[in-house]
């Protein structure tokens, strides 16, 4: 069994904090929330402090922020129906582009591995894919409408230009660009959850996906490609995603976020019961029937709903969380 040790508790935002995002180098992170501001934090000695406050980009709550893979750009998704792109080209962070098109709140934003594509999703049920067309230029490459409800989260595959989205319609969708006509198509629908899918994350090589839901379960999905040795049929020679494991009974309320550590393979969850839980794949786990066990639970990690968790991409075992209680916490996972 492991233990989660609280290292730092940080305050600064007014109201609930919706999102936290580590910089690719792992030595800085950004946070966003109800106060319409983005804070960028860095470590000085042994303490974290706000280095920059960006407060002029949005008119309403900022729901999510994501750094580009190169670490030069920060994208923020807001309830004001826009996505802002920030960069430090002049030495100070400034908003260099505002992406408009969604009809309602933008819930999530994600950069592709190459940094050449950006995805956004909204309460308007659509997923948009944007091409980075040059300095501060973004062009809409696709507007995708396969979901029947609010889309909560978009996440790019860690190595390929494949996009996953999670929705209030209880499903996850996969998208890829067609080799024939360069159109973006929905290539798979992952159905097993019985309520809203709040968040998703790929494992390190992108062959598996974890999802978390309002139905209080976690699910692990595996990709089966055409010609796979497990005998899973792949109609139209498209990759099929199959639910290979369901984790239930550990969470008492909706699970709002999930993070699959690319360094350790540990899975962290953020829950509406104020808790953070850590899961590890069992040593005798089978490829097509994997088993995971809860290794630790911080039942009262925050005083209110935990909205977001993310493993540090560089420092193995370091986890960040944020909550409706207005705090950010940094944790260390010990074996």
From Swiss-Prot:
Annotated keywords: Repeat, WD repeat
**Where, in residue numbers, are the WD repeats?**
12-51, 57-96, 101-140, 146-185, 192-231, 250-289, 301-335
Annotated GO biological processes are:
iron-sulfur cluster assembly; protein maturation
| UniProt cross-references to Pfam families, sorted A to Z | WD40
Q: Which InterPro entries match?
A: CIAO1/Cia1, G-protein_beta_WD-40_rep, WD40/YVTN_repeat-like_dom_sf, WD40_repeat_CS, WD40_repeat_dom_sf, WD40_rpt
Gene Ontology CC: cytosolic [4Fe-4S] assembly targeting complex; metallochaperone complex
**Role this protein plays:** Essential component of the cytosolic iron-sulfur (Fe/S) protein assembly machinery. Required for the maturation of extramitochondrial Fe/S proteins.
Q: Member of which family?
A: Belongs to the WD repeat CIA1 family.
**What is this protein identified as?**
Probable cytosolic iron-sulfur protein assembly protein Ciao1
The record lists the organism as Drosophila willistoni (Fruit fly)
Lineage, broadest ranks: Eukaryota, Metazoa, Ecdysozoa, Arthropoda, Hexapoda
GN (gene name): Ciao1
């Amino acid at each position: 069994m492991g233990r989660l040790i609280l290292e730092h508790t940080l305050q600064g935002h007014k109201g609930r904090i919706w999102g936290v995002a580590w910089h690719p180098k792992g030595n800085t992170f950004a946070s966003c929330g109800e106060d319409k501001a983005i804070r960028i934090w860095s470590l000085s000695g042994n303490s974290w402090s706000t280095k920059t406050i960006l407060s002029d980009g949005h008119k309403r709550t900022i729901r999510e922020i994501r750094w580009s893979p190169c670490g030069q750009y920060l994208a923020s998704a807001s309830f004001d129906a826009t996505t802002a792109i920030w960069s430090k080209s002049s030495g100070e962070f400034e908003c260099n582009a505002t992406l408009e098109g969604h009809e309602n709140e933008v819930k999530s934003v994600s950069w592709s591995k190459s940094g050449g594509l950006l995805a956004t999703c909204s309460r308007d049920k659509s997923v948009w894919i944007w091409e980075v067309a040059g300095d501060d230029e973004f062009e809409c490459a696709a507007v995708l409408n396969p979901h029947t409800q609010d889309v909560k989260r978009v996440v790019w595959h860690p190595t390929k230009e494949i996009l996953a989205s999670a929705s209030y319609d209880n499903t996850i969708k996969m998208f890829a660009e067609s080799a024939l006509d360069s159109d973006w198509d929905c290539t798979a629908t992952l159905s097993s959850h019985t309520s809203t899918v709040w968040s998703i994350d790929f494992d390190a090589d992108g062959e598996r996906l974890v999802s978390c839901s309002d139905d209080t379960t976690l699910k692990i999905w595996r990709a089966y490609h055409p010609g796979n040795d497990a005998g899973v049929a792949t109609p139209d020679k498209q990759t099929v995603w199959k639910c290979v494991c369901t984790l239930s009974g550990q969470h008492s309320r909706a699970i709002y976020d999930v993070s699959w550590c690319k360094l350790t393979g540990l899975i962290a969850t953020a829950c509406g019961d104020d808790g953070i839980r850590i899961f590890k794949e069992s040593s005798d786990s089978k490829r097509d029937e994997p088993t995971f066990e809860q290794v630790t639970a911080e039942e009262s990690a925050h005083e209110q709903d935990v909205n977001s968790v993310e493993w540090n991409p560089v420092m193995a075992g370091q986890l960040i969380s944020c909550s409706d209680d207005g705090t950010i916490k940094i944790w260390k996972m010990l074996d």
